[in-house]
């Protein structure tokens, strides 16, 4: 059973990535509270815009890019090969996103409902959507990311299947469109139009179709049959196999 679950090494890496990402979620929640109070309130749908003395847009975009770099860096350290690193990134991103709202809600008293609208991201345009939408994506990322990291730890790296990758890209594109469609329409009006934007309807049918494709790609990759053994994979899986009490490195 321990081998199937990935052993202590696998769960140690999963826990380490999750704790790091959860701590980042708290830091993100605290930083966003400060920024939104500077701009007139924590609820982006009802706040009255107040322009601070210094423009913070460039700093905020840079902070978001730095956050992605931090998540990617810890994923590169946690994984040994493509499966572990990709899995660690999914786990870190999903945990960060979920814990951000788990910390933000009690600290700020908002959102009051999973259907409240929020500004989700700013790169390349503002992403708008109900809080529930990114939470669903984050949950799928956590489950599939942890599964990939555990599989790598036990030396059972799944085969990379390009049809699943294409399905995931298509699903991600559909979800991204639902988030930025309103901002893309308003972009012609410049920064003032983007600041004044308050979406009123979310394209749930398109989002759910994209989410189904994205989740299927995530989970399909995490559960795919193991790739044929290679010398590189043997080196990556050697620590997990050597730790097995029966020493049966080649018995499956």
Q: Positions of the model-derived regions?
A:
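Structural signal for the C-terminal ends of transmembrane alpha-helices
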Residues: 2-6, 74-82, 143-154, 219-226
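Interfacial segments of alpha-helical transmembrane regions
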Residues: 9-21, 79-95, 156-167
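Alpha-helical transmembrane segments of multi-pass membrane proteins
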Residues: 21-38
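Interfacial helix-loop-helix junctions of multi-pass membrane proteins
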Residues: 34-40, 102-121, 184-195
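Perimembrane loop-to-helix junctions flanking transmembrane segments
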Residues: 39-56, 194
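Membrane-interface loop-to-helix entry segments
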Residues: 50-73, 122-144, 201-209
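Small-residue hotspots
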Residues: 87, 94, 138-140, 145, ...
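Membrane-proximal helix-loop-helix units in multi-pass membrane proteins
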Residues: 98-157
